[in-house]
Amino acid sequence: MSEQSQLDDSTIDKLIPQIFNEMRSNLNNTTNKFPKSTGGGASDNISANSNSIRSFNSITTQSLLKESESLDKITAMIKNVTAALKNNLPVYVNQVHEVCKSTNSILDSWINIHSQAGYIHKLMSDQTYLKLINDRLHNENVNTNDEDGSTLHNVIALKKKEILDLRQKLENRKGEKDAAPAKPPNQGLNPRYGVQSGRRPVPSAGISNNGRVRKTHVPASKRPSGIPRVTNRWTKPTASSSRKMFR
């Protein structure tokens, strides 16, 4: 076992053909030892068995040799394919890169065309733009020497002037608001009544808003009544109070 473990692949590759050759030579020697006989018997059986063994071994050996030749051809083909891929891979990568660049440029052009088409559709749906175009065409028909498109330029100048005027007004409003002094907290109060101007003063007690004298509010416990009040619990009630109680 130690000797077999020490054998490497190259040694095994060299020993396999030698083993097959020895087996073939031994088979030939065994077949030559037995003479051919015309009669039946053990010699005929031995020769038949030897012939079958020799044919089987020859078929197995031939098939192994053919497989070995096929493997050698396949190995050579794989080597050729690997070499071709190594040499042509950068070229293929460059071709793929160029195809991707051209595809991206086509897509960018299509996106630009689509955006411009959408912008033109939006302009053609705007009535103001159509009116300006019609005015310009009318002006060109009337004044053939007008090369600057004065109608369109005049409209644009007017729009710019309006925008500048609005900005100036906004800045003036902001300046006035910043320059205005802050009002004190008690400004706007009437010094006589201590209330804000524009509001009616609160009337004093006993005088209503229309100038009439109001009656003072008297609690119910202090209002006069016909029933006498008993201050002492042992005081005997009078006859008049009794009659009022049982009436």
Swiss-Prot record:
Positions carrying N-acetylserine: S2
A GO BP annotation: protein transport along microtubule to mitotic spindle pole body
Listed GO CC annotations: cytoplasm; DASH complex; microtubule; mitotic spindle; spindle pole
Segments of this protein annotated with the region Disordered: 27-47, 172-247
Keywords: Acetylation, Cell cycle, Cell division, Centromere, Chromosome, Chromosome partition, Coiled coil, Cytoplasm, Cytoskeleton, Kinetochore, Microtubule, Mitosis, Nucleus
Impact when changing A157V: In DUO1-1; produces abnormal spindles resulting in growth arrest at 37 degrees Celsius
Effect recorded for A117T: In DUO1-2; produces abnormal spindles resulting in growth arrest at 37 degrees Celsius
Regions of compositional bias (Polar residues) in chain numbering: 232-247
Subcellular compartments: Nucleus; Cytoplasm, Cytoskeleton, Spindle pole; Chromosome, Centromere, Kinetochore
One Pfam family from the record: DASH_Duo1
Protein name according to UniProt: DASH complex subunit DUO1
Family statement: Belongs to the DASH complex DUO1 family.
Further details from the record: Present with 996 molecules/cell in log phase SD medium.
Known partners and oligomeric status: Component of the DASH complex consisting of ASK1, DAD1, DAD2, DAD3, DAD4, DAM1, DUO1, HSK3, SPC19 and SPC34, with a stoichiometry of one copy of each subunit per complex. Multiple DASH complexes oligomerize to form a ring that encircles spindle microtubules and organizes the rod-like NDC80 complexes of the outer kinetochore. DASH complex oligomerization strengthens microtubule attachments. On cytoplasmic microtubules, DASH complexes appear to form patches instead of rings. Within the complex, DAM1 and DUO1 may form the microtubule connections.
Main function: Component of the DASH complex that connects microtubules with kinetochores and couples microtubule depolymerisation to chromosome movement; it is involved in retrieving kinetochores to the spindle poles before their re-orientation on the spindle in early mitosis and allows microtubule depolymerization to pull chromosomes apart and resist detachment during anaphase.
Residue stretches in coiled coil: 152-180
Keyword Cytoplasm among UniProt keywords: yes
